[in-house]
Amino acid sequence: MSTAITRQIVLDTETTGMNQIGAHYEGHKIIEIGAVEVVNRRLTGNNFHVYLKPDRLLDPEAFGVHGIADEFLLDKPTFAEVADEFMDYIRGAELVIHNAAFDIGFMDYEFSLLKRDIPKTNTFCKVTDSLAVARKMFPGKRNSLDALCARYEIDNSKRTLHGALLDAQILAEVYLAMTGGQTSMAFAMEGETQQQQGEATIQRIVRQASKLRVVFATDDELAAHEARLDLVQKKGGSCLWRA
């Protein structure tokens, strides 16, 4: 009988903001880390939660997302002061993060600012992007944290603003539901049912082929576009370019 221990850390961060052009983390700082420990698919209560002083002002847009004020952070520790404790907490675990590129980008940037030759996070942790997992399970569907909560009937009523620990706790519940083998057949058949209903009421019209030349984006261009929209939606809560 296997006695292997699987340790996962479900993690989320809040930041001073993000860049729309270039590296999304450059010049910005992490102001909150929330992490929830899951061992063998059980929440242990051994969580990591800290607010951080960024030594810079927050962007107004970021404040609108998480509601954390500059004044509140003045007496909080800096990332440098908690870095060792944080690394000890996550080292060797599988990190589960929704749109992992956002948070890992910030974490690696913060580590690099310490000038201690700390390696990339993915060298001492396995990183799993729960957004990528959700997209494979539900292609073409909305897979934001709120959408997944609705799909799995998980209570997120307290999520009026983004908060790292609350979001990590909610994501832990969502991820356990996603990977627990209890997905309702209704999820898989949702699109098929809608299509069948639509075909009963829609009259198909054959149009003449257009002579206009249509230029399609390449796979790389589409991937880059989706990655940027992910970052916008991650910390904005919504994205104008997505339904």
Predicted regions span which residues?
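Long, acidic, intrinsically disordered low-complexity segments
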Residues: 102-105, 109-130, 219-243
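Conserved non-catalytic scaffold segment of RNase H-like nuclease domains
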Residues: 1-124, 135, 147-161
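Acidic, Mg2+-coordinating catalytic module of metal-dependent nucleases/exonucleases
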Residues: 12, 94-100, 106, 144-203, ...
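Alpha-helix initiation and N-capping motif
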Residues: 83, 142-145, 222-225
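Catalytic subdomain that performs nucleotidyl-dependent activation
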Residues: 124-142
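Amphipathic alpha-helical transducer elements in NTP-driven molecular machines
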Residues: 80-83, 127, 142, 165-168
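Acidic two-metal-ion nuclease catalytic site recognized across multiple nuclease folds
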Residues: 2-3, 177-243
